[in-house]
């Protein structure tokens, strides 16, 4: 079992040397994009966190917070994400964070088709695409059969491993890791994503 944490600007400045030395973390999902009133922006701590993790040999993946309800909005998010990722290498998946209440303006079929299109674009870039959401959103706002080709990163804090098929389970938002002030999200996965991506040739530099 592997432990993965995810961080964004809200964790502030992280002492990554201490995180690494703790031996508690096997990988990190960094927020690449946030959203401000529906407008995407590159997380201001992304570059700093990425550079530190690479320096220390901590496997890195990314996620971006999506508010897109149209194809042009989705494509604008992807264009900015590509700018953020160009020249970098990932050892963990690239995840689309699908949880914003504004996304409920779409039917489950329409939203799932939009998200699947984004995931296919990530794959076109040579990334391992993943979809992040929480259990109630998956049950009520998405058509999960449409998203079945992509690993699911599922948030569920009820203490029991979710029955829904998933690649990674975010089990708490109140984790504690040395080197990080305050609580942090923690996930578990049985998949050795760095080895999986390496075998598939998906850990190459993003062009």
Q: In which residue ranges do the predicted regions lie?
A:
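Short beta-strand/turn micro-motifs composed of small residues
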Residues: 64, 133, 156
């Amino acid at each position: 079992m592997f432990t993965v944490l995810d961080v964004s600007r809200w964790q502030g400045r992280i002492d990554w040397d201490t995180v690494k030395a703790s031996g508690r973390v096997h990988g990190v999902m960094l927020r690449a994009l946030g959203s401000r009133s529906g407008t995407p922006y590159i997380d201001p701590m992304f570059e700093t966190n990425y550079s530190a993790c690479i320096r220390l040999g901590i496997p890195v993946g990314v996620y971006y917070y999506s508010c897109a309800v149209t194809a042009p909005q989705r494509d604008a998010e992807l264009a900015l994400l590509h700018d953020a990722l160009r020249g970098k290498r990932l050892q963990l998946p690239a995840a689309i964070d699908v949880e914003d209440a504004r996304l409920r303006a779409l039917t489950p079929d329409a939203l799932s088709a939009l998200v699947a299109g984004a995931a296919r674009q990530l794959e076109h870039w040579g990334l391992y695409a993943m979809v992040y959401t929480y259990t109630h959103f998956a049950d009520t706002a998405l058509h999960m059969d449409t998203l079945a080709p992509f690993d699911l990163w599922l948030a569920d804090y009820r203490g029991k491993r979710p029955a829904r098929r998933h690649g990674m389970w975010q089990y708490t938002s109140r984790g504690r890791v040395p080197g990080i002030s305050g609580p942090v999200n923690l996930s578990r996965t049985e998949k050795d994503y760095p080895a999986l991506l390496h075998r598939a040739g998906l850990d190459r530099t993003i062009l």
